[in-house]
């Protein structure tokens, strides 16, 4: 076995492994410090509950504060909302003219009616219960519409005319541009002050100004300062972040100056973020002071019962590094409880679950290096640390190629030196995001294969004395542990080479997910055909000869049937990967996942414990019992699927690295149990199958 693996390459891989473990330890410390979850609900959502139930808003706010909500989300207010709560009085020109035609005097708007200056396609605004609110409205209207569309048409009382479409849009037409009544104005000082009075922090969601300029952005922060509220974060609203497209850097500057965190809402597919123009540039200008934010999709929540929704939050915080739980209330009674009681219980249980997993409640945590002054700093490892990783990963790739093509040591070293220098230059000089992605792909595809080649060679070495079933099970158990450890070398490389704030937040993502599932299967198949002359009728030659013989095989009906089964398996295998899978998950499997989530710290992946690891045990059984090579090869391919899945888990950079390691161990434990059951079942059934086979052949 020693002659097949270059000890120099092994030494380089060992050095890289030490570096990767050090970098992953640093990452673990950063993830451990990021331990605060913000529990957020919308101010207007709680206001809606109060109105719906006929309760005091003060009582509702106090109840949700006690239940565990730490922050209220405040949007830009609108003329429609302020008119509904009586702070101002707003009416369309068309309504005034119709009222006048019916004999009405216009009330507060009588002066403009009497002068005959009412424009149908306009909105007229005057004071309601608050002069302060009217003052803010006038300020916001000038910022949003400018002097050309706005004029004061009366002084006592002050009446403002805004030209524009006054139509109120229903929910069915939400994608239309809102009219003047529903268009965003600015943040409500009144709402932010009320949030402060009840002990809440505030997350603001102002909409972008069209067009934008420095003063309009400054107006947002003047309003925040005026309120005196503790505003901890900003989440975009609409289709653009504030400052898009030309003032993103300035918006980031103001957010950082206010010590605010940028909340980025996870996409409902759980892959990256809800689309918004300027989202990623703002995150970069914020130096990745970003909190991943989770909201249950509105359409999905309508289908959920409260207990189903409840189980998601703490698990999401732990597995996907969510740090803002953006909770929308249930607006339909459930379980015989009104919406206030239902939602108070919902929030309280979320808070309890989050804290039970070791998190604190408060302003959202962020990924930050441990700086001397305690200030925020994004985590990007020193580029020099990536150089030994690059050489180690390339050494693994060259080791595999040597198994196929029998490279001399001279060629191995030339390939390593050339590839290592190119990778090092791109990493040191440019940061090499593409190089890091490529290195991660090599590590994720090659090391599971190398792991299985070691095990197969071990089987070849040990199978001369065919053991009984018990000894096979014992051997396969420690051999699977060895395979997992060897695959974890590649997993550690993946986690280390991609480890920085942008990947932790999933702003950058690993791009080779589908290839990581397919390539190990292809690579182990090529190696196995080369090593054991499978499908070549005993003819010895290089990989090209084996492939030529393979593609020269006469196709029969049984081949077509086999390929059909293989295509279906591949469709399920690849189609179930990623976040936009076209293959639905059966209800029984969903229940099994829920059970495993409750029973284990990190639910293992089905490809490991249901496919890969049981196949490993059966492959060991087949090897020791000297089954036909084709059957051995198919089982080894199945075992490689498990090892590849194990490594691919570490490419989910938003998942804490320690959880990925524990997931691998959990997968090993559960897979070993199923594998042992599979071997026992086969060993019991095999004599009957062989007996039936002999009878069948006798009758032929």
For the regions a language model picked out, list residue spans one by one.
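Cytosolic-side membrane-insertion boundary helix
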Residues: 358-416
């Amino acid at each position: 076995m020693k002659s097949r693996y270059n000890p120099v390459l092994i030494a380089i891989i060992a050095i890289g492994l030490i570096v990767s473990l050090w970098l992953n330890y640093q990452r673990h410390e950063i993830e451990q410090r990021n331990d605060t979850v913000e529990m957020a609900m919308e101010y207007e959502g709680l206001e809606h509950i109060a109105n719906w139930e006929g309760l005091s808003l003060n009582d509702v706010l106090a109840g949700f504060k006690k239940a565990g909500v730490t922050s209220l989300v405040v949007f830009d207010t609108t003329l429609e909302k302020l008119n509904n709560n009586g702070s101002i009085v707003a009416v369309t020109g068309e309504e005034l003219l119709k009222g006048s035609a019916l004999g009405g005097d216009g009330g507060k708007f009588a002066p403009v009616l009497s002068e005959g200056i009412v424009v149908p396609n306009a909105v007229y605004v005057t004071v309601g219960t608050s002069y302060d609110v009217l003052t803010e409205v006038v300020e916001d209207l000038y910022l949003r519409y400018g002097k050309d569309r706005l004029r004061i048409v009366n002084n006592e009382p002050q009446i403002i005319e805004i030209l524009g479409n006054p139509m109120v849009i229903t929910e069915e037409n939400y994608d239309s541009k809102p009219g003047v009544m529903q268009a965003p104005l600015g943040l409500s000082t009144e709402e932010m002050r009320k949030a402060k009075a009840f002990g809440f922090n505030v997350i603001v969601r102002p909409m972008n100004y069209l067009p934008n300029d420095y003063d309009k952005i400054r107006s947002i922060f003047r309003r925040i300062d005026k309120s005196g509220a503790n505003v901890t974060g900003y989440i975009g609203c609409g289709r653009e972040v504030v400052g898009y497209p030309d003032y993103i850097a300035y918006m980031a500057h103001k957010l950082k100056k206010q010590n605010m965190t940028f909340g980025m809402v996870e996409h409902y597919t759980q892959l990256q973020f809800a689309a918004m123009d300027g989202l990623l540039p703002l995150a970069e200008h914020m130096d990745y002071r970003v909190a991943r934010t989770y909201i249950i999709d509105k359409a999905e929540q309508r289908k959920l019962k409260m207990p189903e929704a409840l189980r998601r939050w703490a698990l999401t915080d732990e597995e996907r590094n969510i740090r803002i739980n953006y909770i929308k209330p249930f607006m339909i009674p459930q379980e015989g409880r009104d919406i206030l009681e239902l939602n108070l219980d919902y929030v309280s249980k979320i808070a309890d679950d989050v804290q039970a997993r070791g998190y604190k409640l408060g302003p959202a945590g962020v990924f930050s290096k441990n700086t001397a002054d305690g200030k925020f700093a994004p985590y990007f490892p020193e580029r020099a640390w990536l150089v030994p990783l690059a050489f180690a990963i390339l050494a693994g790739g060259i080791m595999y190629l040597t198994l196929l093509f029998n490279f001399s040591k001279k060629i191995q070293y030339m390939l390593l030196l050339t590839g290592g220098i190119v990778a090092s230059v791109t990493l040191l000089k440019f940061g090499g995001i593409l190089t890091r992605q490529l290195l991660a792909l090599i590590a994720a595809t090659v090391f599971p294969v190398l792991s299985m080649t070691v095990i197969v060679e071990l089987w070849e070495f040990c199978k001369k004395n065919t053991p009984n079933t018990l000894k096979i099970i014992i051997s396969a158990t420690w051999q699977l542990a060895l395979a997992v450890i060897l695959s974890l070398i590649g997993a550690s490389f993946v986690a280390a080479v991609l480890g920085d704030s942008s990947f932790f937040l999933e702003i950058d993502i690993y791009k080779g997910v589908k290839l990581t599932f397919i390539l190990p299967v292809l690579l182990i198949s090529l190696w196995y055909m080369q090593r054991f002359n499978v499908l070549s009728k005993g003819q010895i030659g290089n990989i090209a000869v084996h492939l030529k013989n393979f593609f020269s095989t006469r196709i029969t009906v049984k081949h077509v049937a086999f390929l059909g089964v293989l295509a279906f398996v591949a469709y399920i295998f690849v189609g179930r990967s990623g976040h936009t899978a076209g293959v639905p998950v059966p209800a029984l499997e969903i229940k099994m996942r829920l059970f495993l989530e409750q029973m284990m710290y990190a639910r293992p992946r089905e490809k490991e414990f249901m496919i890969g690891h049981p196949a490993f045990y059966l492959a060991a059984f087949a090897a020791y019992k000297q089954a036909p090579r084709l059957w051995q090869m198919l089982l080894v391919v199945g075992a490689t699927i498990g090892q590849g899945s194990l490594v691919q888990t570490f490419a989910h950079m938003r998942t804490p690295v320690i959880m990925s390691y524990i997931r691998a161990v959990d997968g090993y434990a559960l897979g070993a149990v199923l594998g042992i059951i599979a071997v026992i079942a086969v060993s019991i059934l095999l004599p009957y199958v062989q007996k039936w086979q002999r009878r069948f052949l006798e009758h032929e």
